[in-house]
């Protein structure tokens, strides 16, 4: 750790404090994540170390690069490449004008490329949200914290006792499904796509049941026809209110037909029918995709 000079605290992630730091030997600016684990007494689980070490192999232009893993007396530091801003801050800064559609399209395309790459290596994210999508001044967007959920679990609260958001969580997880797939990340990205377009969260639930009911009120309460097996999921209740599905033109009014078609496939209830990242990249919505540069206020 003595090789790094902390420059400033840049945030508080799910697992610990994140610092902007400088490598004293190379001058490289990095993001330093200090991982706080409940197992402070026993040290860092070897399974977590193994999982994290595998992530160093995930090299892709749309994945935040894990440069190093530093394990010293019961603490774990992850050294990542540094990016200027996260998508949440960028959306907040663009709240009045909105993000231009060509930039939304570029961001979604890049994120799907990153997901397709990770999913092809059987790595899930499980906790995608605007706060862990990072952008730079050149128009790139990258997925951060990939694979950390598998190494450390997804806590209910962060180490500072903040509630971990449910807004982007797939319905199969909310319904208690223990075995889920890459489709959970596509759901999260669909919610983020809608949020970039409308400038507000699609399903801003404040509890698991509120989260489910917000989804049901928009997409209709799922049944065996749209989602075979749903009624036998651990947390499914026959007493759930029966809501009808809303028209997507009312849900995301600014989007054209291609955009609505892609979004509805990303938000398919049945994870087996939900579009894959690879298939989404070939969707007509992206036939005119470009790579514009954002106006970042840093």
Curated annotation (Swiss-Prot):
Changing residue 45 to L: In a glioblastoma multiforme sample; somatic mutation. Its cofactor is Mg(2+). The modification Phosphothreonine is found at residues 14, 160. InterPro entries: CDK, Kinase-like_dom_sf, Prot_kinase_dom, Protein_kinase_ATP_BS, Ser/Thr_kinase_AS. Its main location: cytoplasm. PROSITE patterns: PROTEIN_KINASE_ATP, PROTEIN_KINASE_DOM, PROTEIN_KINASE_ST. SMART domains: S_TKc. Its EC number is 2.7.11.22. GO terms for molecular function: ATP binding; cyclin binding; cyclin-dependent protein kinase activity; cyclin-dependent protein serine/threonine kinase activity; magnesium ion binding; protein domain specific binding; protein serine kinase activity; protein serine/threonine kinase activity. Gene3D superfamilies: Phosphorylase Kinase, domain 1 (3.30.200.20), Transferase(Phosphotransferase) domain 1 (1.10.510.10). Residues 4-286 form the Protein kinase domain. Binds 2 Mg(2+) ions. The keyword Manganese does not apply. It is an enzyme of class 2 (transferase). The modification N6-acetyllysine is found at residue 6. One of its GO terms (cellular component) is endosome. Phosphorylated at Thr-160 by CDK7 in a CAK complex. Phosphorylation at Thr-160 promotes kinase activity, whereas phosphorylation at Tyr-15 by WEE1 reduces slightly kinase activity. Phosphorylated on Thr-14 and Tyr-15 during S and G2 phases before being dephosphorylated by CDC25A. Nitrosylated after treatment with nitric oxide (DETA-NO). Mg(2+) binds at residues 132, 145. Changing residue 14 to A: 2-fold increase in activity. ATP binds at residues 10-18, 33, 81-83, 86, 129-132, 145. It is found in: Cytoplasm, Cytoskeleton, Microtubule organizing center, Centrosome; Nucleus, Cajal body; Cytoplasm; Endosome. Belongs to the protein kinase superfamily. CMGC Ser/Thr protein kinase family. CDC2/CDKX subfamily. Found in a complex with CABLES1, CCNA1 and CCNE1. Interacts with CABLES1. Interacts with UHRF2. Part of a complex consisting of UHRF2, CDK2 and CCNE1. Interacts with the Speedy/Ringo proteins SPDYA and SPDYC. Interaction with SPDYA promotes kinase activation via a conformation change that alleviates obstruction of the substrate-binding cleft by the T-loop. Found in a complex with both SPDYA and CDKN1B/KIP1. Binds to RB1 and CDK7. This is Cyclin-dependent kinase 2. It comes from Homo sapiens. The lineage of its organism: Eukaryota, Metazoa, Chordata, Craniata, Vertebrata. The gene is CDK2.
